[in-house]
């Protein structure tokens, strides 16, 4: 099971009714946060989720509305008596930016592990999450993220017995472990069938449409995408500032065909994103204009 919460849906500045865009994932007791702008910890408090289990924080880029909430968030995690390391992930320059922000949060009861992304496409694993980072097209270096909870194939009892694999190792092999036993190397592929569809969520914001977005969001359970402007006359603003129109996002959704799509990162001038919903659903029917606090409980497909 993967729980997703879109903590905020705003871009540029927080508003009384709209926090800045940020997404939290929960799986197997480990939380992953993407972006941490001003007020993110308040949005998390309103949701009722704890900051203590946040093991990973990914940043799309280093504009203030995506990272300025980090010092307070880290201090709150410390006040919650967290002591385990926290992994910070983002484009090149993260160590410098975090170092500057930590001048107002110098003492933490847990270490920070900083990993900078430098390639156009990178993959890493953090706890239960397999994370793909892919570069998008903003005014500064910016990444989108796809998080996946993989799922192994079914356990094949007959294959296990035929290879005389002791039953005491079956559960460990099913969990993906490799075992050395009496001179033999027992591997999961010896007893598991083909991998099954996992759970995937793609999150991207602050970008013009690029092919990589639809590629990574293809057939996802949930696709969370920037929709900065709904008004068609704002297309010049979107192009100049490297943001995305509702209609452009909907076209990416049509191409990727996720099971569900949420728009986020609305311009502060956009009071009622839902006014454009009928228009963009003509492009991609499964698109929604998200609101702060929207959640989804995503599970594996039934066999």
Task: Indicate where each model-derived feature is located.
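General small-molecule cofactor/ligand-binding pocket signal
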Residues: 5, 89, 113-118, 132-134, ...
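Binuclear metal-ion centers of metallo-dependent hydrolases, dominated by the metallo-beta-lactamase
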Residues: 119-121, 210-303
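Active-site-proximal loop/helix segment associated with metal-binding centers of metalloenzymes
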Residues: 16, 129-203, 207-216, 222-224
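Conserved beta-strand hairpin/beta-sheet module of binuclear metal-dependent hydrolase folds
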Residues: 1-47, 85, 145-147, 193-204, ...
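Active-site metal-binding motif and surrounding structural segment of the metallo-beta-lactamase
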Residues: 38-89, 113-121
């Amino acid at each position: 099971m993967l729980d997703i919460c879109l903590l905020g849906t705003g871009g540029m500045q927080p508003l009384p009714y709209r926090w800045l865009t940020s997404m939290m994932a929960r799986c197997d007791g480990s939380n992953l946060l993407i972006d941490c702008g001003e007020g993110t910890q308040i949005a998390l408090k309103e949701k009722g989720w704890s900051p203590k289990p946040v093991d990973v924080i990914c940043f799309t880029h280093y504009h203030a509305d995506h990272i300025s909430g980090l010092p307070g968030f880290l201090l709150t995690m410390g006040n919650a008596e967290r002591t385990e390391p926290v992994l910070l992930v983002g484009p090149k320059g993260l160590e410098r930016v975090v170092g500057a922000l930590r001048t107002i949060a110098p003492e933490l009861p847990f270490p920070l592990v900083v990993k900078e992304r430098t390639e156009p496409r990178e993959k890493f694993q953090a706890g239960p999450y397999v994370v793909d980072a892919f570069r998008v097209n903003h005014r500064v270096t910016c990444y989108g993220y796809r998080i996946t909870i993989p799922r192994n194939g079914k356990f094949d009892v007959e294959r296990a017995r035929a290879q005389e694999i002791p039953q005491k190792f079956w559960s460990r092999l099913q969990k993906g472990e490799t075992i050395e036993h009496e001179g033999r190397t027992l591997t999961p592929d010896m007893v598991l069938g083909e991998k099954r569809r996992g759970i995937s969520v793609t999150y991207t914001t602050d970008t013009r449409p690029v092919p990589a977005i639809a590629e990574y969001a293809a057939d996802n359970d949930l696709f969370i995408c920037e929709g900065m402007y709904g008004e068609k006359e704002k297309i010049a603003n979107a192009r100049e500032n490297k943001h995305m129109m509702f209609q452009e996002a909907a076209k990416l959704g049509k191409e990727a065909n996720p099971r569900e799509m949420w728009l986020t990162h609305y311009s502060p001038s956009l009071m009622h994103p839902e006014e454009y919903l009928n228009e963009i659903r003509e492009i991609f029917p499964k698109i929604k204009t998200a609101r702060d606090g929207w959640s989804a409980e995503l599970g594996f497909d039934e066999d």
